[in-house]
Amino acid sequence: MRHYEICFIVHPDQSEQVPGMVERYRAIVTAKGGSIHRLEDWGRRQLAYPIQKIHKAHYVLMNIECDGDTLNELEHSFKFNDAVLRHLTVKMKAAVTTPSPMMKEEKSKSMMPGDAAPAAPAETAAA
C-alpha cells in the first residue's frame, strides 16, 4: 500500500456537513484495509483566488495509506460531490503523522498570551 496526502476544499455553505463527509471518506479507506495517519480540519479559510465566486472555503487535510483502487474510489467520490470545490492528492514516500505547518501556525497563534492582554484595555477604554 502507498501513502498519500489529500487536501480538499469544501463549499462554505456545506461546512456543517464536513464531519459526515470525513466519516464517509474514512469508511472508504478503512473498508479495504487502509489507514488514516493524520486528519486535520483547518476550518474556514480565505481562498487564494475566488472559485465559483466564493472567497472562503472549508479546508480538510488527510494523510492515508491505501491501494490504488481505494484511491480511485475516493477521488471519484470527490469529483461527484458538489460540495467539494477542489481536491489534491500527492503521493508520499512515508506516512506523515506530525502536525502540518498550518496546524502548528494555528496552535502558536492560539497559545500566544499577547493576544488576550491587548484586548482587555481596549474594552475598558470603550466602557
UniProtKB/Swiss-Prot annotation:
It comes from the Bacteria. One of its GO terms (molecular function) is small ribosomal subunit rRNA binding. Residues 99-127 are annotated as: Disordered. GO terms for cellular component: cytosolic small ribosomal subunit. Gene3D superfamilies: 3.30.70.60. Keywords: Ribonucleoprotein, Ribosomal protein, RNA-binding, rRNA-binding. Residues 110-127 have a biased composition (Low complexity). GO terms for biological process: translation. InterPro entries: Ribosomal_bS6 (IPR000529), Ribosomal_bS6_sf (IPR035980), Ribosomal_S6_plastid/chlpt (IPR020814), Transl_elong_EF1B/ribsomal_bS6 (IPR014717). CDD domains: bS6. Belongs to the bacterial ribosomal protein bS6 family. Binds together with bS18 to 16S ribosomal RNA. This is Small ribosomal subunit protein bS6. It comes from Dechloromonas aromatica (strain RCB).
